[in-house]
Design a protein with these regions (language model features):
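N-terminal secretory signal peptides that target proteins for export/translocation
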Residues: 1-12
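N-terminal cationic leader/targeting segments used for protein routing and processing
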Residues: 13-14, 37
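Intrinsically disordered, low-complexity regions enriched in serine, threonine, proline
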Residues: 3-5, 28, 52
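Short, low-complexity interaction segments enriched in Ser/Thr/Pro/Gly
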Residues: 9-10, 28, 33
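Scaffold/interface architecture of coatomer-like assemblies
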Residues: 31-336
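Bacterial N-terminal signal peptides
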Residues: 17-27
Length: 336
């Protein structure tokens, strides 16, 4: 066993590149050679796309009626996009079931021990309900995060491999959810083969072990264009902890255009899995070219509205930072 800077034994074949944070970690590589501690937090890469020196912004929008039902038959003319209050020109629009790069991020802390079997079953249900061309990876986390696909794969479409990864149970320790999400965002950015990217996060408590901040993860998620769907199996035994967890999960969903779920019982996770898969497959893809092409690093607030009968709700990412498209330092999760 090799012991890393956080005082926890790590499998011998693990690789720890250090999560992005102000704290410095001591690390060792596969062959025991020292790994340089991370430097200052790098500039986060923009989720916008550059084509011939023109920046475009990709959005994935979900539209629901007052009863919570998806509205999937709206034309392009029904949508209006605003950036910092200024109406933008939509250059591409479609509603179709496209394959996605999907990350399943599952809490493996001690408090999840009795819930894992139902959560694993629900995760597989989500995959089976999703587009058959989706590519999937699995990250289990307690006080550290592990990318757990067999043979060190980055993604798989094999249900048996996903099942094997989800069953790598080591339910103990704390909850480093933010670290796990930040790693997963970077993994999608570097390795994903699909344009649309989704993370589904299942946890039962407030983060108590991460090195990266919530602000860092929210910003990274906004820049990447990933949709985050958090599922919080939160206990009311410690109301203040549950409230903090609920706020953090809500912030991630709101920033990215995803949706939060707070089931009272773990048995409800199966139904939620069906809902999330259905939502992902019935969204609108909207592309616009910002009228303001300057790279001034400011936050650009995005608002999408719909002109159609009935009270409708639109979910999409809340904005992005106008920064140049450049590589971002990446976190690393050990493979087991």
């Amino acid at each position: 066993m090799i012991f890393l800077g956080r005082g926890r034994p790590t499998p011998k074949n693990g690789v720890w590149g250090g999560f992005l944070a102000t704290a410095l970690l001591a690390g060792v590589s596969l062959r025991g050679q020292p790994v340089k501690p991370p430097g200052p937090e790098p500039v986060i890469d923009s989720g916008t796309v550059f084509r011939s020196d023109t920046r475009v912004v990709d959005l994935h929008a979900t539209v629901m009626d007052s009863g919570g039902h998806l509205v999937t038959n709206l034309p392009r003319q029904a949508f209006t996009v605003y950036e910092n209050g200024v109406q933008q020109m939509i250059t591409n629009f479609k509603r179709e079931d496209v394959p996605v790069s999907l990350g399943l991020i599952v809490d493996n802390s001690g408090s999840m021990r009795d819930k894992r079997s139902k959560v694993e079953a629900a995760a597989l249900t989500l995959v089976k309900d999703s587009n058959p061309q989706d590519e999937v990876f699995v990250v289990n986390f307690n006080d550290e995060a592990y990318k757990d696909l067999p043979h060190g794969k980055d993604f798989t479409s094999d249900i048996k491999e996903m099942e094997e990864a989800l069953k790598r149970i080591d339910s103990r320790g704390g909850t480093a959810m933010r670290d796990a999400i930040r790693f997963s965002i970077d993994h999608l950015k570097e390795k994903a083969h699909r344009e649309k990217k989704v993370l589904v996060v299942v946890t039962d408590g407030n983060d108590n072990s991460s090195l990266v901040t919530l602000q860092n993860v929210v910003r990274a998620s906004q820049q990447s264009g990933v949709l985050i769907y958090p599922v919080g199996l939160l206990s009311e035994e410690v109301p203040e902890e549950a409230r903090r967890a609920q706020q953090a999960l809500g912030a991630l969903a709101e920033a990215t255009g995803g949706e939060t779920f707070f089931p009272k019982e773990v048995s409800e996770v199966e139904r939620i899995a069906h809902t999330v898969a259905h939502n992902i497959r019935n969204q609108y893809s909207i592309v616009y070219t910002p009228a303001d092409q300057s790279m001034d690093g400011t936050f650009r607030q995005i608002k999408v509205t719909v002109n159609a009968p009935g009270p409708l709700t639109v979910r999409s990412r809340s904005g992005y930072y106008a920064t140049p498209d450049q590589a971002v330092g990446s976190t690393r999760a050990p493979a087991r």
